[in-house]
């Protein structure tokens, strides 16, 4: 099938094809369709509610983080929290998720409007990342935790085992990238702090020349800065990478 967009005659046909790739067949075709529908389609259901993959993406992101955390906890019993967190950050970053999506050729199945498709939407790394997270959420809704755990473990455990050394943290990677490209070093700005003292949330921003600004939130400044750096690296990669 290569990189040719898949043309299904029905959702059942699409379900049959994808089931052979992911080793899971959806009981509810509608859940699969929602997981593959890009927001550009502006699809609405009988209740006039917008149906696309964004809600399932939100769910799938949390499920992926949980299962990958459990995999790392099992594989690296002697490592401290900080080291495990660095491994997880690398395993659940946008680039890794998009690479898994490319391995299963998920872009061929994303449903989007003509404009998005003509602009390379089926190869866009962010679209691939979002659709795969939505697919993970959909497998959980349709088939339960055991099935989604099987899918995530298949595609992430070997990656985790292959991490012979700790990955570089996103802040260091971003700093090295700016130095290499002769740009000012990234500055992390605290935009706001919300929530009670015992459970605060920090919003951090970074602005890189020619790439604009990104924002990230977390329960500590350190984690928020790492997330912001990761988002900026993904933004840079999406802007520069030719797929």
Curated annotation (Swiss-Prot):
This is Ribonuclease 3. Coiled coil: none annotated. Mg(2+) binds at residues 57, 130, 133. It is found in: Cytoplasm. SMART domains: DSRM (SM00358), RIBOc (SM00535). Residues 169-238 form the DRBM domain. Digests double-stranded RNA. Involved in the processing of primary rRNA transcript to yield the immediate precursors to the large and small rRNAs (23S and 16S). Processes some mRNAs, and tRNAs when they are encoded in the rRNA operon. Processes pre-crRNA and tracrRNA of type II CRISPR loci if present in the organism. InterPro entries: dsRBD_dom, RNase_III, RNase_III_dom, RNase_III_sf. It comes from the Bacteria. Pfam families: dsrm, Ribonucleas_3_3. Keywords: Cytoplasm, Endonuclease, Hydrolase, Magnesium, Metal-binding, mRNA processing, Nuclease, RNA-binding, rRNA processing, rRNA-binding, tRNA processing. Transmembrane segments: none annotated. It is an enzyme of class 3 (hydrolase). The lineage of its organism: Bacteria, Pseudomonadati, Pseudomonadota, Alphaproteobacteria, Rickettsiales. NCBIfam families: RNaseIII. Residues 15-144 form the RNase III domain.
């Amino acid at each position: 099938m290569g990189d040719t967009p898949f043309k299904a005659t029905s959702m059942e046909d699409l379900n049959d094809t994808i089931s052979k790739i992911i080793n899971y067949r959806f009981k509810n075709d509608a859940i699969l369709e929602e997981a593959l529908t890009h927001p550009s389609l502006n699809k609405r259901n009988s209740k006039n509610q917008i149906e696309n993959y964004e809600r399932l993406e939100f769910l799938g992101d949390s499920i992926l983080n949980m299962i990958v955390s459990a995999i790392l906890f099992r594989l690296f019993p002697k490592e401290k929290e900080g080291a495990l967190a660095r491994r997880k950050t690398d395993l659940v970053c946008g680039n890794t998720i998009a690479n898994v999506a490319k391995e299963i050729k998920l872009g061929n199945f994303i449903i989007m409007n003509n404009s998005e498709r003509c602009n390379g939407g089926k190869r866009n790394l962010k679209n691939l990342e979002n659709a795969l997270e939505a697919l993970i959420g959909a497998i959980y809704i349709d088939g339960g935790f055991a099935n989604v755990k099987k899918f995530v473990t298949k595609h992430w455990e070997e990656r985790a085992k292959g991490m012979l050394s700790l990955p570089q943290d996103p802040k260091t990677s971003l700093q090295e990238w700016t130095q290499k490209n002769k740009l000012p070093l990234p500055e992390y700005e605290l935009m706001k702090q919300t929530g009670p003292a015992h459970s605060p949330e920090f919003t951090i921003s970074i602005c890189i020349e020619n790439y604009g600004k990104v924002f990230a939130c977390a329960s500590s400044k350190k984690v928020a800065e790492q997330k912001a750096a990761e988002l900026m690296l993904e933004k840079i990669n999406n802007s520069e990478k030719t797929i």
